[in-house]
From Swiss-Prot:
Lineage of origin: Bacteria, Pseudomonadati, Pseudomonadota, Alphaproteobacteria, Hyphomicrobiales
Cited PANTHER family: GLUTAMYL-TRNA(GLN) AMIDOTRANSFERASE SUBUNIT C, MITOCHONDRIAL (PTHR15004:SF0)
Function (record text): Allows the formation of correctly charged Asn-tRNA(Asn) or Gln-tRNA(Gln) through the transamidation of misacylated Asp-tRNA(Asn) or Glu-tRNA(Gln) in organisms which lack either or both of asparaginyl-tRNA or glutaminyl-tRNA synthetases. The reaction takes place in the presence of glutamine and ATP through an activated phospho-Asp-tRNA(Asn) or phospho-Glu-tRNA(Gln).
Keywords: ATP-binding, Ligase, Nucleotide-binding, Protein biosynthesis
Name of the protein: Aspartyl/glutamyl-tRNA(Asn/Gln) amidotransferase subunit C
Keyword ATP-binding: yes
């Protein structure tokens, strides 16, 4: 797959990145280099290789999945200018 200037501009637009005409050429080259590397990765034979999440053999610590309120509501609103029943009070912004 090859990236052309139109694709570079479209990607920049989708990413909300301003790209000048001078930057399009170098970006096109960089994106094509990235895609070429990804194509090389696709050629690697991974048959029989187990998926892994880390390069070191470690287990994730597990804990019980318990729902609670955190017990810190009063600490959280302690520095708020105005509160009521552990809720932040803010000025009305919509009529």
């Amino acid at each position: 797959m090859s990236v052309d200037e139109t694709t570079v501009r479209r990607i920049a637009h989708l990413a909300r990145i301003a790209v000048t005409d001078e930057e399009v050429g170098p970006l096109k080259g960089e994106l094509n280099a990235i895609l070429a590397f990804v194509e090389q990765l696709g050629a690697v034979d991974v048959e029989g290789v187990e998926p892994m999440t880390s390069v070191t053999p470690m287990r994730m610590k597990k804990r019980a999945d318990v729902v609670n309120d955190g017990g810190r509501a009063s600490d959280i609103v302690a520095n708020a200018p105005e509160t009521e029943d552990n809720y932040f009070l803010v000025p009305k912004v919509v009529e």
